[in-house]
Every structure is written in structure tokens, then in C-alpha cells.
Amino acid sequence: MSHTIVLLQTTMGKSSRTFMDYESVNQAIEGICNMYEQRLKQERPNQKNITYDISQLFKFIDSLADLSCLVYTSHINAYTPYNKEWIKTKIINHLQKLAQ
């Protein structure tokens, strides 16, 4: 497991910057998906079941001013940065594993 920090900026304003930390990349990816699901629940409070497809999730990710991950790499004793495209790839892999 590699400690992972998710850096998030929802708008261009610096005040929208925040971070979340997780014990692993998988937990971070689940956290990002959960963040989108929570947003959908807020937008549709009367809808009992929330469904979405991956293109909607990716559109949400692209709408964020910034989303990146810092993943701890033990052999260099440092955090390695990853961008939105890497996150999207990890989401695809994560969802494929869930579908099996």
C-alpha cells in the first residue's frame, strides 16, 4: 500500500483548494468516485438510486480546476505526482475490477 494524497481545486479560486489523504491508491480512487457520487446526491436529493456512467464521471473530473495525486514511492522515499489522465486510467482499472 502506498500512502496517497489527493490534491483538489474545484474552481480557479485558491480558496477552493483542499486535500484528502488515503492509505492506498485504490482507496484514493474510491474516494474520488465517492466525491462525485456525493455531489450527484446533493444535486438530486429526491432520487433514491443514483446512477452514472464513466463519461459523466470523467466530465466532472475535467470540470475541476485541478485534481492530482501524490503517491508515496518507498524506493526513492518521496511522493510521485500524477495528473488527471493517470487518475482516469486508475478509475477505469478500478471499475473493471469491480465488474468482475
Curated annotation (Swiss-Prot):
Signal peptide: none annotated. InterPro entries: EHR_sf (IPR035912), ERH (IPR000781). Pfam families: ER. The keyword Glycoprotein does not apply. The keyword Coiled coil does not apply. Keywords: Cell cycle. Homodimer. Belongs to the E(R) family. May have a role in the cell cycle. This is Enhancer of rudimentary homolog. It comes from Dictyostelium discoideum (Social amoeba). The gene is erh.
